[in-house]
Amino acid sequence: MTPWYLYLIRTADNALYTGITTDVARRYRQHQTGKGAKALRGKGELTLAFAAQVGDRSLALRIEYRIKQLTKRQKERLVTEREAFEALLSSLQTPVLKND
């Protein structure tokens, strides 16, 4: 199973873009050369603010969705406090019990 990563890229105007990939370095290069997400094109200098392995694609999609719902302040906290990210990741890894 190929591991998936979540990453946050900071734009020149200090915005944070959230994405997932199996290869952070490759995806970051794509964004820098204008071959990544349209949302980052023309945004000036890009810096990789955060990256972490999150598991399989399903979990990566769930955490990406959850992070995209956060406020800018909450996203900044994930970048600066690893424990905040680990807590969020852990909350999404908890199995959901289904009633039969």
From Swiss-Prot:
InterPro entries hit by this protein: GIY-YIG_endonuc, GIY-YIG_endonuc_sf, UPF0213_domain, UPF0213_GIY-YIG_endonuc
Q: Which residues form the GIY-YIG domain?
A: 2-77
Q: Which domain of life is it from?
A: Bacteria
Transmembrane annotation, as ranges: none
Task: Extract the CDD domains matched here.
Answer: GIY-YIG_UPF0213
Q: Which Pfam families match?
A: GIY-YIG (PF01541)
Q: Which PROSITE patterns match?
A: GIY_YIG (PS50164)
Return the similarity comment: Belongs to the UPF0213 family.
This one is known as UPF0213 protein YhbQ
Q: Which organism is it from?
A: Salmonella typhimurium (strain LT2 / SGSC1412 / ATCC 700720)
